[in-house]
Structure formats: C-alpha cells, structure tokens
Amino acid sequence: MANPRQRRKARSGSTLKPSLNAKKQMKKKLARAPTIHGADVLKDNYDPKLTLRQNYARLGLVPSLDVRPNTGGTERAPSSISASSSKEGQAAVRKGMARVIRDDAGNIVDIIEADEHDQDETAWGKPLPSSIADRSDVPTFMPVSQPASNPDALQQLEQIASQAAPVERHTSQKESQWLVELVKKHDDDTQAMAKDRHLNLWQKTEGEIKRAIRKAGGFQALRTSA
C-alpha cells in the first residue's frame, strides 16, 4: 500500500516515470507508419501497410533500385543454379587428366580430355581464366520488370523529374556584410582573409572564402556595396 507522499507525487506529475497516457502515446508512435517526405503523388499512392520495396514494385519503380542478392533481392531459380554449376563442372578439366562418363550400368560412354589450347602455358605461367564479362551464365539478380498498377502516378513522377532544376543559393545579410568587410580590408587577397584572426572568426579556409565571394556576386559587387 502506497503512502500519502507517493500518492501526491503520482497526482502532481513530479515522478520521473511516464504516466499511463504517456505510455499509450509511446506505443502509438512505435506502431505509426513513418512520414513520407516527397512529392504529393508519392504520398497519395504510398500504402503504409506495405514495405518500401513492395510500394516501389506497385508503382513500377523496382528495376531502378539495382537490387543486390544480400539486400532483399530476388534469388536465382534452382534450375539456373544447377545449370550454371553443371557448366562450371564440365568446363574444369585439369591438365593431363580426363573425365570418364559412364551410363547407369557402369559402361564407359564418353571420355572428355582437356583442350590442348587450355593446356598451353606461357613463359610466365598458366593463362588467366576467361573474363566474367564473356560468360553468358552470370546472374544479374535483377527482379523481373513488373507493370505499374497506377501508370498515371508513374507519369506524374517522370514529369516532375523532367522539370527538376538546380536550387539557387543566396548569400545571407550577415554573411554579405562579413564579406564586404573582408574585401574592404584585404581587397582580393583571399590568403590574407583566411589568416585574419579578427575578421575570420570561424576560421574559414581560403577555398571556402572564394566560394562565398563567388556566390555573393564577386569582388566587384562587394566593392560597390561597401
């Protein structure tokens, strides 16, 4: 049984433990889907009950993700795995050795010997194996392209992407005033500006000062505004 002091603490809210309502709000935040930041088209067509990859697949954007096998990508079918392994097993024949192929009864059906061209050795050793780019059985692990369930949303996203433009950066009033003082004192000597202990309080490098002056319009614009 709690004493009166503990009861007063619980009523006054001075305790450090979260209340029952606070615990409910914390559970709601954990179960709540993350906020989607982006275009309105993406927000309207995003299903919070699906995963991110499932939403991209529903919008027809999966092939643009360049999925890798260890990051939730699609795996190869067992037939392709066995076919590639059998090809690799048939291609590997050691020098001076041969592979004997028998039937179910144990009779010799065929003998596969190493190719003379593969047995040739150069003066610096055995030749390197063929490049992986020359092989036709190299898996890409890319998912199969799926049609978009909402082609209008995909067209709107493509239209937004085609109208993208670089963001113009502007110099703030305080930074412009600081650059005017630097140019008034050192003219165009950016090296002296970087070494000035009184004006260069933030220890900006020479390159950072040059970029700031270029963004503000150049030396001439700063001289005229002085």
Swiss-Prot record:
Q: Where in the cell is it found?
A: Nucleus, Nucleolus
Annotated InterPro entries: Ribosome_biogenesis_Nop16
Q: Name one GO biological process term.
A: ribosomal large subunit biogenesis
Lineage: superkingdom: Eukaryota
* Positions of disulphide bridges: none
Region: Disordered, residue numbers: 1-23, 65-90, 118-151
Q: Name one GO cellular component term.
A: nucleolus
Q: Which UniProt keywords apply?
A: Nucleus, Ribonucleoprotein, Ribosome biogenesis, rRNA processing
Composition bias (Basic residues) maps to: 1-11
| Assembly with partners or alone | Component of the pre-66S ribosomal particle.
Query: Which protein family is it in?
Result: Belongs to the NOP16 family.
| Function (record text) | Involved in the biogenesis of the 60S ribosomal subunit.
Q: What is this protein called?
A: Nucleolar protein 16
What species is given as this protein's source? Mycosarcoma maydis
